[in-house]
Amino acid sequence: MTSLVKPQHYPELFRRYEGNPILTANDWPYPVHTVFNAGACQIGSTTLLLVRVEDRRGHSHLSVARSDDGISNWRIDAQPTFPPDPANYAEEAWGVEDARVTWVADRQEWIIAYTAFSPIGPLVSLASTVDFQSFIRLGPVMPPRG
């Protein structure tokens, strides 16, 4: 039998915050079932999370949470920030999930890669924003597997 041993030649890079989770469904200003992993960025001195939130039907949307220290005193948008739009984007019929946020200096805007989910399966889509209040959907960039 083998045992897992922490290698001694690698320094510890990260330590899990003892107060996790920093956000739960109870923190949301509207009824939700669960909150999941978020895309994160720093805007000035503010930490911004674009959080995957599952509603009580099991469909996901994205919601913005802001904090001055990235740990406490979160200010969460009163309504879903980036809800699915299946009337115009069929690939979002079952929700939008798992955002990743990147500042693109050449464009002077944030690009968001997210999972659009529908009966055809999950696929990667892009959107852009300058303020995390309004968004331009750029559409799918990777088709569903299969």
Where do the language-model regions lie?
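Beta-rich carbohydrate-recognition and catalytic domains
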Residues: 1-94, 103-146
